[in-house]
């Protein structure tokens, strides 16, 4: 149930299928509600990390923070030998954020897998691009979501004097401030929970997912559409132990398939394909599923002589202009079996909020943007939001400013929209460009991939952008 928008002068219900109706009117009056400096609505990875970032900020030592999580507290007493099928690719920038408040140490003491190279290639041609670093720095880390959540929970428990966490608590109503000319004089946000309890906050941060109740309540428009794809995830056992420090991604005509390292013998699968094919993959027997995965990575059945010849000609021309070592295509490790019950699917889509902030409101993570998993940037975009917003709020707290003032919230919005919009557009373009086997488009992307792979500075810029 989406939270309903209420004016201070009485409840205003939205008409069927309309956006929230707002009755702005000046209000004044006393209240005995508990007041928090910041309330974070949504206690998933991004919401919990946002609460941690503020809870450990030196300029927030005298602030009160509330984290609302609709689900129960997740306790990870000990690691299971079986890996979870829900993992995230953590960029170096995100690892730095997690390190800033101590969560990364917990992750390192539990389990994660670093990868130092990434190979991306086309199923319809020989075109590929290889990302690696000469100094052998880690390009990223594959971490189970449960491990990240455990680390964040531990760190939240250590600052319980600053951060209050309410589990099984969901906001059902927000009472919004009137849009006064001066944000500093604007009333605070009133929040009503399902059990009837109420709070006030100087700043409400929406981290409540792509169906964000905060975003809907404040009336921020969201541009979104569903893709004609679902993602199948699973935990795979390799045929033999390997160093397994490469992330593999192949663009099939039906969608990208990725193999992400978990250990010497295990990898995580993310296969984006049509809804019908995804349902088949989840329901087929193990042997057929394993054969389908290996074929998706190894088969050249979608190649054509015309595309291969044209690609070879460009590769030859590039070698004449730049006679350096060219990346040779490598094959990923073969898969032997799949963990029982690890296969699940979820639908894919794109979304982007027209605004990230309003007076006393900020959106982060999936509440502000939703992206296709082919870029592996979903949670990293959310962590990037946290780094930016926490910086602006810390500066405001240091200077004694109102945390809910748009004067510094818009700085966060400008920074993150510039970054996120570019990434969303590029990801959507790649999804559409690689979802076809039409020869002209295959040739275009083949030449584009080969040219990009040949220009080292361009590859370095791409890696730098993705690592933030």
From Swiss-Prot:
Any GO molecular function: 2-methoxy-6-polyprenolphenol 4-hydroxylase activity
Aminoacyl-tRNA synthetase among keywords: no
Pathway field: Cofactor biosynthesis; ubiquinone biosynthesis
Primary localization: mitochondrion
E.C. numbers: 1.14.15.45, 1.14.15.46
GO biological process: ubiquinone biosynthetic process
Membrane-spanning residues: none
Effect noted on mutating residue 261 to L: In COQ10D6; uncertain significance
Annotated localization: Mitochondrion inner membrane; Golgi apparatus; Cell projection
One GO location term (cellular component): mitochondrion
Tissue expression as described in the entry: Widely expressed.
Pfam families linked to this entry: FAD_binding_3
Alphabetic keyword roster: Cell projection, Deafness, Disease variant, FAD, Flavoprotein, Golgi apparatus, Membrane, Mitochondrion, Mitochondrion inner membrane, Monooxygenase, Oxidoreductase, Primary mitochondrial disease, Transit peptide, Ubiquinone biosynthesis
Cofactor entry: FAD
Catalysed reaction equations from the record: 4-hydroxy-3-(all-trans-decaprenyl)benzoate + 2 reduced [2Fe-2S]-[ferredoxin] + O2 + 2 H(+) = 3,4-dihydroxy-5-(all-trans-decaprenyl)benzoate + 2 oxidized [2Fe-2S]-[ferredoxin] + H2O; 2-methoxy-6-(all-trans-decaprenyl)phenol + 2 reduced [2Fe-2S]-[ferredoxin] + O2 + 2 H(+) = 2-methoxy-6-(all-trans-decaprenyl)benzene-1,4-diol + 2 oxidized [2Fe-2S]-[ferredoxin] + H2O
InterPro entries from the UniProt entry: FAD-bd, FAD/NAD-bd_sf, Ubi_Hdrlase_CS, UbiH/COQ6, UbiH/COQ6_monooxygenase, UbQ_mOase_COQ6
Transit peptide residues according to the UniProt entry: 1-28
Topology versus the membrane: Peripheral membrane protein
Assembly notes: Component of a multi-subunit COQ enzyme complex, composed of at least COQ3, COQ4, COQ5, COQ6, COQ7 and COQ9. Interacts with COQ8B and COQ7.
Protein function: FAD-dependent monooxygenase required for two non-consecutive steps during ubiquinone biosynthesis. Required for the C5-ring hydroxylation during ubiquinone biosynthesis by catalyzing the hydroxylation of 4-hydroxy-3-(all-trans-decaprenyl)benzoic acid to 3,4-dihydroxy-5-(all-trans-decaprenyl)benzoic acid. Also acts downstream of COQ4, for the C1-hydroxylation during ubiquinone biosynthesis by catalyzing the hydroxylation of 2-methoxy-6-(all-trans-decaprenyl)phenol to 2-methoxy-6-(all-trans-decaprenyl)benzene-1,4-diol.
Clinical note on disease: Coenzyme Q10 deficiency, primary, 6: An autosomal recessive disorder characterized by onset in infancy of severe progressive nephrotic syndrome resulting in end-stage renal failure and sensorineural deafness. Renal biopsy usually shows focal segmental glomerulosclerosis.
Family listed: Belongs to the UbiH/COQ6 family.
Name of the protein in its database record: Ubiquinone biosynthesis monooxygenase COQ6, mitochondrial
Source organism of the structure: Homo sapiens
Gene this protein is translated from: COQ6
């Amino acid at each position: 149930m989406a939270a309903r928008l209420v004016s201070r002068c009485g409840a205003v219900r939205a008409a069927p299928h309309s956006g929230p109706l707002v009755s702005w009117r000046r209000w004044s009056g006393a209240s005995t509600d508990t007041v928090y400096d910041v309330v974070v609505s949504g206690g998933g990875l991004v919401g919990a990390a946002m609460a941690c970032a503020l809870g450990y900020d030196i300029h927030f030592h005298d602030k009160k923070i509330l984290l609302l999580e609709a689900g129960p507290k997740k306790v990870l007493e000990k690691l299971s030998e079986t890996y979870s099928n829900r993992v995230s690719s953590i960029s170096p920038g995100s690892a730095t954020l997690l390190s800033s408040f101590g969560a990364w140490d917990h992750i390192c003491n539990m389990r994660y897998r670093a990868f130092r190279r990434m190979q991306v290639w086309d199923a319809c041609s020989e075109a590929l691009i290889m990302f690696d670093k000469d100094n052998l720095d880690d390009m990223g880390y594959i971490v189970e979501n449960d491990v990240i959540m455990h680390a964040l929970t531990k760190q939240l428990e250590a600052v319980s004097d600053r951060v209050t966490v309410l589990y099984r608590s969901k906001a059902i109503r927000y009472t919004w401030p009137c849009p006064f000319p001066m944000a500093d004089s604007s009333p605070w946000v009133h929040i009503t929970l399902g059990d009837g309890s109420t709070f006030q906050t100087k700043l409400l941060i929406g981290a409540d997912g792509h169906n964000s109740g905060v975003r809907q309540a404040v009336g921020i428009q969201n541009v979104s559409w569903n893709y004609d794809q679902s993602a199948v995830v699973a935990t795979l056992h390799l045929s033999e132990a390997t160093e397994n420090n490469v992330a593999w991604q192949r663009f099939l005509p039906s969608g990208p398939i990725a193999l992400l390292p978990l250990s010497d013998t295990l990898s995580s699968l993310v296969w984006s394909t049509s809804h019908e094919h995804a349902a088949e993959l989840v329901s087929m027997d193990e042997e057929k599923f394993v054969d389908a995965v290996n074929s998706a990575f190894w088969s050249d059945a979608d190649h054509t002589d015309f595309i291969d010849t044209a690609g070879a000609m460009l590769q030859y021309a590039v070698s004449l202009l730049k006679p350096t070592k060219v990346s040779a295509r490598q094959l990923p490790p073969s898969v032997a079996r799949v963990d029982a019950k690890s296969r699940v699917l979820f639908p894919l889509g794109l979304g982007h909020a027209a605004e990230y902030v309003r007076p006393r409101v900020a959106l982060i993570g999936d509440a502000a943007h939703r992206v296709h998993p082919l870029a592996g940037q979903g949670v990293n975009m959310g962590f990037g939001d946290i780094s930016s917003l926490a910086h602006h709020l810390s500066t405001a707290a240091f200077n004694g400013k109102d945390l809910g003032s748009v004067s510094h919230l818009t700085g966060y919005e400008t920074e993150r929209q510039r970054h996120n919009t570019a990434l969303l557009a590029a990801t959507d373009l790649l999804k559409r460009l690689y979802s076809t086997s039409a020869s002209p488009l295959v040739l275009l992307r083949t030449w584009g991939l080969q040219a990009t792979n040949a220009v080292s500075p361009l590859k370095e810029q791409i890696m730098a952008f993705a690592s933030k």
